[in-house]
Amino acid sequence: MDELTRRVLGMFDEMGRDALDLHELFEAGGNDADARRQVLYAVESLVERGLLEERGNDFYALTVAGREAAAPAQGGEGESL
């Protein structure tokens, strides 16, 4: 799993929330417009892979698989993607 994808998944734990809106997830890319575009692509990929679910109004939540995938960054034993 690439670093940006790990950062996107880690945002949920960092913010201590079950669901985040796209603007909060953009923080994983910082202030650079290209990096934020890459965050958008990462979010779309995570939804397609079943690691995030869309909640409407640009909100996204981790799925069970997403929590497991995020676990290695948090010291757990999640899968390597």
State where each predicted segment sits.
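Minor-groove-contacting beta-hairpin "wing" of winged helix-turn-helix DNA-binding domains
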Residues: 58-64
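Short amphipathic alpha-helical interface segments
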Residues: 1-31
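Short amphipathic alpha-helical interaction segments
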Residues: 32-48
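A generic structural-conservation signal
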Residues: 21, 55-56, 79
